[in-house]
Amino acid sequence: MLAEKLQINSITPHPSVEYWSVCKVEALFETPFLELVYRAAQIHRKHFNSRTIQLSTLMSIKTGGCPEDCGYCPQSARYHTGVQNQQLLDVNEIIAKAKIAKARGAGRFCMGAAWRGPKPKDIEKVTEIIKAVKSLGLETCGTFGLLQDGMAEDLKEAGLDYYNHNLDTAPEHYAEVIGTRRFDDRLSTLGKVRKAGLKVCCGGIVGMNETRKERAGLIASLANLDPQPESVPINQLVKVEGTPLADAEELDWTEFVRTIAVARITMPKSYVRLSAGRSGMTEEMQAMCFMAGANSIFYGDKLLVTDNPEEDGDQLLMAKLDLEPETAENKK
């Protein structure tokens, strides 16, 4: 299948890691719901403290005006979504936000820029920002798009810990969502990131009119990366008026929980992050996601330009569920 060929040609699965065919992952999705969640919960407890949640804060440091045509994204210059373009923020403004994030319990500060990919002059500014955030004692993560040769090394030298570069969706469904880049382009940048010694944050989006088999294809593609991503954000589509996917078919909540569980089973040592779309989830649905193996969230009232639950609400939910922020002391 295309997903398998792309993986083998671009990033070969490690022989010590179980290889996940699309058919094998699809079979997991077909597992009876409660049995699937139970299996995922067992695997989660084997590798992580089940009472801790890793907290990250995400900030848009350059907003809007992106030339890409991603059908889900309100930051594309091709769509009229009401997003106001904003050039790269001043380092002092970013540091002020990072200090607030740390004071509120975040251990990682993630920065996103709406570029197809950064130019060399952008990297100079971004490395300055990374150094400043790193000096606060926070882990750093960046999502800046497709990288040219040498850029990942520059980011690593500046102190970047993680690079986020999502696969978005299954290779078979990719052209239905994005036309300005190829699935292989994502794999190419991920290869550069790994070669530079950076940790990888790589996930995708569900609810973009994909089939269950295509959801399985996304998870298989992620699980077969070598090595597997340290962090796997699973996003539920946030429908934004003006984007091509504004009228996408609603995904049943159990299917999203299944996706979390399958991600946990296939990537047992990765952090599985409950990402975009969480503001539209009930507390009960989020609790099921945590039971199914999600152990990381974005903490803060914005995810780039979309809404996210407020910190007070997250603190209350964590208290109800007897969960606490992950620290070096309570990490398994």
From Swiss-Prot:
Pathway entry: Cofactor biosynthesis; biotin biosynthesis; biotin from 7,8-diaminononanoate: step 2/2
Cofactor remark: Binds 1 [4Fe-4S] cluster. The cluster is coordinated with 3 cysteines and an exchangeable S-adenosyl-L-methionine.
GO terms classed as biological process: biotin biosynthetic process
Cofactor: [4Fe-4S] cluster; [2Fe-2S] cluster
GO molecular function: 2 iron, 2 sulfur cluster binding; 4 iron, 4 sulfur cluster binding; biotin synthase activity; iron ion binding
Chemical reaction(s) catalysed: (4R,5S)-dethiobiotin + (sulfur carrier)-SH + 2 reduced [2Fe-2S]-[ferredoxin] + 2 S-adenosyl-L-methionine = (sulfur carrier)-H + biotin + 2 5'-deoxyadenosine + 2 L-methionine + 2 oxidized [2Fe-2S]-[ferredoxin]
EC numbers: 2.8.1.6
Residues annotated to bind [2Fe-2S] cluster: 110, 141, 201, 273
Binding site for [4Fe-4S] cluster: 66, 70, 73
Domain Radical SAM core span(s) in chain numbering: 51-278
Matching Gene3D superfamilies: Aldolase class I (3.20.20.70)
Family matches, as InterPro entries: Aldolase_TIM, BATS_dom, Biotin_synth/BioAB, Biotin_synthase, Elp3/MiaA/NifB-like_rSAM, rSAM
Superkingdom: Bacteria
UniProt-listed Pfam families: BATS, Radical_SAM
Record text on subunit structure and interactions: Homodimer.
Family: Belongs to the radical SAM superfamily. Biotin synthase family.
Task performed by this protein: Catalyzes the conversion of dethiobiotin (DTB) to biotin by the insertion of a sulfur atom into dethiobiotin via a radical-based mechanism.
PANTHER family in the record: BIOTIN SYNTHASE, BIOTIN SYNTHASE, MITOCHONDRIAL
The protein's name: Biotin synthase
Taxonomic path: Bacteria, Pseudomonadati, Pseudomonadota, Gammaproteobacteria, Pasteurellales
Gene name per UniProt: bioB
